[in-house]
Amino acid sequence: MAILIVVGGPSGTGKSTVGERLSQDLNCPYVEGDSYHPQSNIDKMSHGIPLTDDDRWDWLEKLTKVGVDATSQTGAAVVTCSMLKLKYRDYIKKIARREKPDIKVLMLFLYNDYNIIYKRMSQRAGHFMKNSMLKSQFNDMEVPENEEGAFAIYCGEKSQEAIGKEVLQVARQVMTARE
């Protein structure tokens, strides 16, 4: 059975770094969600305009399809995207199961305190997501609770390496349980 692992959370939690590391540790493909945003979404975010639900649906569908397709290489793939709301996570699961009915979807949601993320984003250069938009992400954020296949991981002041190890441990437990 294939598994699609989605690493999410608000901008600045390190999901791209953690997701890429996880894919290396699991020896499976990595799909960076930011690479699949249409230019219209990038333009909005670059100008400090938060995305709406309508801006996200096509992007989430395309990203999920790419991730599901990538599982055919090794039986697993890691995808990163914010998946801030329950309805986004449900949509990802729906699309994944439509594409591959027996796929397992594991969602690893990284979250942190606003001030920690704001400080980290203030030091980040060259990314289209500006720290001025962090407030809108926190307004939208629904941390998973008792949600099938979803695990919330609080980052705190942990290093990216420590978070990566925690994420890998959860992923391996779930992957072992599916075999």
Stretches found by the model and what they are:
Residues 17-68:
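Conserved substrate/cofactor phosphate-moiety recognition/catalytic segment
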Residues 11:
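The conserved Walker
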Residues 44, 49, 96-144:
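A glycine- and Lys/Arg-enriched "phosphate-lid" helix/loop adjacent to the NTP-binding pocket
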Residues 14:
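Conserved glycine(s) of the Walker
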Residues 123-168, 174, 178:
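Small-molecule kinase domains that catalyze NTP-dependent phosphoryl transfer to phosphate-bearing small molecules
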Residues 54-101:
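Glycine-rich phosphate-binding loop used to anchor ATP phosphates in small-molecule kinases
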Residues 37, 83-85, 111-116, 159:
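Conserved nucleotide-binding/hydrolysis micro-motifs of P-loop NTPases
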